[in-house]
Amino acid sequence: NEAQTDATLAPKEGHTRVFEIKDSASPGGTRKQTWRHASRAECAQCHNNRSANLLAFNPPQLVRNGQIEKMQAWDWFAKPLPKKQPEIADPNDQSSSLHTRARTYLQLNCAHCHRRGGGGTSVFEARIELNLDSTHIVNHPPTQGNLGIKDAMIVQGSDPYRSILYNRMARLGPGRMPRFGS
């Protein structure tokens, strides 16, 4: 609802809303932003049995202030989580390596599909616990088209413009990744 005190399921076909956003850089201090709520069929492409339906936080994001322990004490997990979680980084933390920040991004935004059995149709795996060679990301050819890029790779070392991953994330419309919610 408009007061944001209750949520309702979007119509089966999805719907579009226009919001007025405060923005000091826009004429008059506001701008309009259109948001499309996905259809249920679109939602089910990611929220499915392979992903355990819920796509929210990743356990490594909760390794702070005893959050995992609190949730386990409240019986929020069907089975205990492993004590050791993969290391993730704040993307803005310049003291973390670019490698760790990039792998963190892929873990949190891509690995729910781009993993064995996860539904992603590409052969690469984005899980942070794999060593980089095992992910088949760097200097591996794409399996879902090259977007017209000569000698494209999923990630082309030292040449982001020949990297399908970069181009799909930067793209609007068909071929964009992720397909929805961005």
Task: Report each predicted region and the residues it spans.
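Extended surface/linker regions that mediate inter-domain or inter-protein docking
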Residues: 1-104
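Periplasmic/extracellular electron-transfer cofactor-ligation site
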Residues: 40-55, 108-132
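Electron-transfer interface patches adjacent to heme c in soluble/periplasmic c-type cytochromes
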Residues: 66-102, 112-117, 125-182
